[in-house]
Amino acid sequence: MRLEKIAAKALENVGFDRYLLSIAVAKRANELATGKEPLVEVDVKKYKYTDIALMEIAEGKLKIEVEKES
C-alpha cells in the first residue's frame, strides 16, 4: 500500500485530527527507535520509524486515547 493511503487511513483512525496523529506518530517512532518491537510485520531496516508508526495506526494496532482536561 502506498504511504499516502496509509497516512489517510491513519488520519481516519484518529478522527481526522492531524495534530493528534503527528503527536502519536512521534511518540511511537521514539519508542521504536529505543528498541520496542513493531506491531506490524515489516522489515525495520527498510522503513523509517515514522512510517512504521503510521502503518501501526492505520491497521488499528495502536489505540490512540485523548486525555480530557478537567
Curated annotation (Swiss-Prot):
Enzyme class per UniProt: transferase
Q: Which UniProt keywords apply?
A: DNA-directed RNA polymerase, Nucleotidyltransferase, Transcription, Transferase
Describe its partners and assembly state: The RNAP catalytic core consists of 2 alpha, 1 beta, 1 beta' and 1 omega subunit. When a sigma factor is associated with the core the holoenzyme is formed, which can initiate transcription.
What's this protein's function? Promotes RNA polymerase assembly. Latches the N- and C-terminal regions of the beta' subunit thereby facilitating its interaction with the beta and alpha subunits.
Q: Which gene encodes it?
A: rpoZ
Tell me what reaction this enzyme catalyses. Answer: RNA(n) + a ribonucleoside 5'-triphosphate = RNA(n+1) + diphosphate
Q: Which Pfam families match?
A: RNA_pol_Rpb6
Gene Ontology, cellular component aspect: DNA-directed RNA polymerase complex
Q: List the protein's name.
A: DNA-directed RNA polymerase subunit omega
Q: Which Gene3D superfamilies does the record associate with it?
A: 3.90.940.10
* Family per record: Belongs to the RNA polymerase subunit omega family.
Enumerate the Gene Ontology biological process terms. Answer: DNA-templated transcription
**A single MF term (Gene Ontology):** DNA binding
Q: Which HAMAP family match?
A: RNApol_bact_RpoZ (MF_00366)
What's its EC?
2.7.7.6
